[in-house]
């Protein structure tokens, strides 16, 4: 219920921000694709483990001033997977995630085609877990999900390639994602690149 309220508040603020951007001509939206790496997902005792996955993010924002932006985004991170054997039983697990975030960005220089920026914000995360176990005769599988609130920070850069279009690269650090009741809390490093469109 608390997460649903957060989603409602973020959606409301985003709609107001978009309307304001449309009036002032200071808005932008973009899409980025890259790789996410989950810290401490692989412990070393697995027969196979992949702690990296594809990350896709869609975002939109409003320029508050010549050096500050307010931005909202949705990110999907595909499966990270691990498999191993425990007491003769084969076990496999996969986790993917959905993230909604709101972020304040501060960048410099204030003018020119190239800008670097830092960022800080909050995010709502939802992780989906799939687990399977087999003794060679029978297979058991289960699915679960969990949600919560975390933080995000990072660095980025944009370059205006033409009027109304710029190329953007980001490093995002997602903090305190996950629950101790499931696989535990972790941090996620994400590197992405993609186009951004001004309006």
Feature map (PLM): residue ranges:
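Cleavable N-terminal export/targeting peptides
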Residues: 1-26
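Gram-negative (and chloroplast) outer-membrane scaffold detector with strong preference
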Residues: 22-26, 33-39, 56-135, 188-199
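Sequence contexts marking disulfide-bonded cysteines in secreted/extracellular proteins
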Residues: 41-43, 48-50, 111
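Extracytoplasmic loops and strand-loop junctions of Gram-negative outer membrane beta-barrel proteins
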Residues: 41-44, 85-89, 136-141, 176-177
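Hydrophobic alpha-helical segments of small multi-pass membrane proteins
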Residues: 100-102, 120-123, 149-157, 173
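Short, positively charged, low-complexity/disordered linker segments
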Residues: 138-166
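Hydrophobic secondary-structure block in the mid-to-C-terminal portion of proteins
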Residues: 158-199
């Amino acid at each position: 219920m608390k997460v649903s309220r957060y989603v409602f508040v973020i959606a409301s603020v985003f709609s107001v921000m978009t309307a304001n951007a449309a009036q002032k001509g200071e808005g932008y939206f973009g899409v980025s694709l890259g790789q996410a790496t989950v810290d401490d997902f692989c412990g070393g005792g697995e027969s196979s483990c992949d702690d990296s996955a594809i990350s896709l993010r869609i975002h939109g924002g409003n320029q508050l001033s010549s050096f500050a932006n307010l931005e909202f985004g949705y990110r999907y991170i595909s499966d990270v997977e691990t498999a191993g054997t425990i007491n003769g039983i084969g076990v496999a697990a996969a986790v993917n995630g959905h993230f909604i975030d709101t972020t304040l960005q501060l960048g410099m220089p204030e003018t020119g085609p190239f800008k670097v920026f830092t960022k800080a914000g909050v995010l709502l995360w939802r992780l989906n877990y799939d687990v399977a176990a087999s003794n060679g005769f029978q297979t058991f599988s289960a699915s679960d999900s969990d949600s919560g609130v975390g933080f995000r920070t990072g660095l980025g850069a944009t370059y205006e390639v033409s009027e109304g279009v710029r190329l953007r690269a980001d490093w995002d650090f997602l903090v305190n994602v996950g629950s101790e009741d499931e696989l535990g809390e972790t941090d996620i490093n994400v590197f992405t690149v993609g186009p951004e469109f001004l309006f």
